[in-house]
Amino acid sequence: MAKQEYKQLPKRAEVHSATEQFKDTIKTSLGLDLFKGLGLTIKEFFSPSVTIHYPMEQLPLSPRYRAVHNLQRLLDSGSERCIGCGLCEKICTSNCIRIITHKGEDNRKKIDSYTINLGRCIYCGLCAEVCPELAIVMGNRFENASTQRSQYGSKSEFLTSEQDAKNCSHAEFLGFGAVSPNYNERMQATPLDYVQEPSKEESKEETPTNPESNKGDENV
């Protein structure tokens, strides 16, 4: 292993006289670094404000935002979309979904109870991805603070009202590939945006010509 060599930096010259102290003070206080810091401060002072005064102001949420779940209904009849298959309960990684069903007179499953323990839910969205009927989707209601645990997870809290379903007033789930609102304004430039493609004239000038191939073409 090579031996490392350390060099001692020269010491700063000591200032003794009052004139030299005054010159050193002016040099350090009125140097270029001070003006750089002041320029940055003034620039940010007059720049537009980006602060959101929550809760009076709120940012638009993306359609892919994962918050408290919504149980959807059919738009025409207003009936519940959930068929009680239990796929959401089986795929739930935090084991927070509980479905109790029974067979009705038509041998179809009827839902007795559908609960989601929001205290254990990690909002991964797997239940919404696996649902074959789009009955459970991820909503955008994130203000769900409460002092009692019993207020979380009841079916009536998640289920869309029948009147909203018949009036088609509730929004359908746009899917996990939906774009966010104002995505053009929020899109930032990448390094590839600053690369300029060569024009056609420049590309023609840069293409090398092989004289031997031209001679062969003339002989033919």
Swiss-Prot record:
Catalysed reaction, written as an equation: a quinone + NADH + 5 H(+)(in) = a quinol + NAD(+) + 4 H(+)(out)
CC annotations in GO: plasma membrane
Membrane topology recorded in Swiss-Prot or TrEMBL: Peripheral membrane protein
Residues annotated to bind [4Fe-4S] cluster 2: 92, 121, 124, 127
Pfam families: Fer4_7
Cofactor descriptive note: Binds 2 [4Fe-4S] clusters per subunit.
Superkingdom of origin: Bacteria
Homology family: Belongs to the complex I 23 kDa subunit family.
HAMAP family per record: NDH1_NuoI (MF_01351)
Protein name: NADH-quinone oxidoreductase subunit I
Organism, scientific name: Helicobacter pylori (strain Shi470)
